[in-house]
Amino acid sequence: MWWLAALFYFVFICFSESRASLLATTVSVLVILYDNKRIRNVLLSRKVLVVSIPLILLLLYLIYRFKANSANGRLLIWRVSFDMFKEKLLFGFGPGGFLAHYMDYQANYLSDHPDSPFLLLADNVNNPFNEYILVLVNYGIVGFCCLMASIVAVFKRLLLLDEEKRIILSSCTVVLLVVSFFSYPFSNPFVWVVSTVIIMIVLFESTGKKSGLLAIPISVCSVTGIIISVLSFLPEREWQVISQRSLMGETETVLPDFRRLHERMKNNGSFLYNFGAELHYSGYFEESLQILEECSSYLNDYDVQMLLADCHQNLGDTLTAIDCYNYASRMVPSKFLPQYQIMNLYLAYGDTVNAVNAANAILAKDVKVSRSKAVQRIINEAESLVKDVMFHSR
């Protein structure tokens, strides 16, 4: 029955098209097999190694080729993240540092490498798709070494458990560690719960009679964690409710609720962006600009820059609006809208030369995917402007 269940699970993973899950499952199975001494000796034999190493390399290549653009996009993220890591080696940017600064570094990297093959793959990014890189960027070498020391300590304790518990907990831990190389499982609260349960079981089971000494500090930490989670969940839940009401057409009604929540969630970039967007939608451009500038300290991406640009545009600050549109275009060069807005701003002020420059920038872009109607309309307008200017200049 176990083998049948495992087969169904493997088929499910394949159909889910999750490369990280497939790789994690494969490694987890190898860990389970490796725990058996007889199987371990077979796996480590020269004949098996000679055959298995090329197969493993082939598997990794096939996993890469399965979604090559997605994989290359992650390579770009990791490359830019390395630039961030070099900037603050020891202690990193602090909690939320990646989210606050990554897009600035991506904009600089792509500006410095205009012929990069990654240009069309660049997009809005809020996570490096690698928990280890996230730790390096946010907490530097010191934080990363603490993480590695904790992982090693857990595995040392795992080896002290009886065979059945050791196999189950080791395979679960390995799955989490492997998936963390290619995704962001720890953004899910459930994964934190599972990880905490694994650590507590390992600590209590491996210490035997000494486990009573660990009960008090672990219980205190667990209760403290639960209290902090609940306290942070309450405003999140209230925010979710008023956001839903806003989507149902009650934006003006819920703006006072957003303002009230602002004091409690002023360090949450996603909340600040949502609040700024609601103010922008309702026409409160000055207040929206203020909130979005706060937001850029915690979350600064293409969408934030586009909203900032539109606020400046509506407040009559054309030059700053153009700067924001240009910065948004540098962040995600494949987007057509920033240069389109710049083209229209210059046209509105009678600056035909710069309007044509923006139009040519639009026409020079490669299309990331098949053209949507909106993109095709932008291209048509840019072509029409260039043709009109060329015709009248004769």
Task: Give the label of every model feature segment.
Residues 1-61, 197-205, 215-220:
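Hydrophobic alpha-helical segments of polytopic membrane proteins
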Residues 24-32, 164-215:
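Transmembrane alpha-helices of multi-pass inner-membrane enzymes
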Residues 46, 141-168, 324, 337:
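Hydrophobic transmembrane alpha-helices and their immediate junctions
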Residues 62-76, 215, 219-253, 270:
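Hydrophobic alpha-helical transmembrane segments in integral membrane proteins
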Residues 95-137:
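Interfacial juxtamembrane loops and adjacent helix segments
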Residues 274, 307, 341, 375-378:
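Canonical tetratricopeptide repeat
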